[in-house]
């Protein structure tokens, strides 16, 4: 299993038509974003005074992420992307 560092997040991209809250995203919006599930998160980032700021997302969250963000990786037969938390646009609440 992949364990990301810092503010990085491992995502499993959902390969289906994207909907948010029951609304199908327009074609142009689908080209700019992807829906994904958070698989793992890093520990967060440290502030200048040393405090740890935890990630805003957790494993199991469904998120909307920038389409061209991140690096494609494989772990066994599974394909994932690793992105910085700043590339995650929203948490999708069901």
From Swiss-Prot:
Pfam families: Cpn10. The keyword Disulfide bond does not apply. Keywords: Chaperone, Cytoplasm. Its main location: cytoplasm. One of its GO terms (cellular component) is cytoplasm. It comes from the Bacteria. It is found in: Cytoplasm. Heptamer of 7 subunits arranged in a ring. Interacts with the chaperonin GroEL. Together with the chaperonin GroEL, plays an essential role in assisting protein folding. The GroEL-GroES system forms a nano-cage that allows encapsulation of the non-native substrate proteins and provides a physical environment optimized to promote and accelerate protein folding. GroES binds to the apical surface of the GroEL ring, thereby capping the opening of the GroEL channel. HAMAP family: CH10 (MF_00580). This is Co-chaperonin GroES. The lineage of its organism: Bacteria, Bacillati, Bacillota, Bacilli, Lactobacillales.
């Amino acid at each position: 299993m992949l364990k990301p560092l810092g503010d990085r997040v491992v995502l499993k991209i959902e390969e289906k038509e994207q909907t948010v809250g029951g609304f199908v995203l327009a074609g142009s919006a689908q080209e700019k974003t992807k829906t994904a599930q958070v698989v793992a998160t890093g520990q967060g980032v440290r502030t200048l005074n040393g405090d740890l700021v935890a990630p805003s997302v957790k494993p199991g969250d469904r998120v909307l992420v920038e389409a061209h963000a991140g690096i494609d990786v494989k772990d066994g037969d599974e394909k994932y992307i690793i992105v910085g938390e700043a590339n995650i646009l929203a948490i999708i609440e069901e």
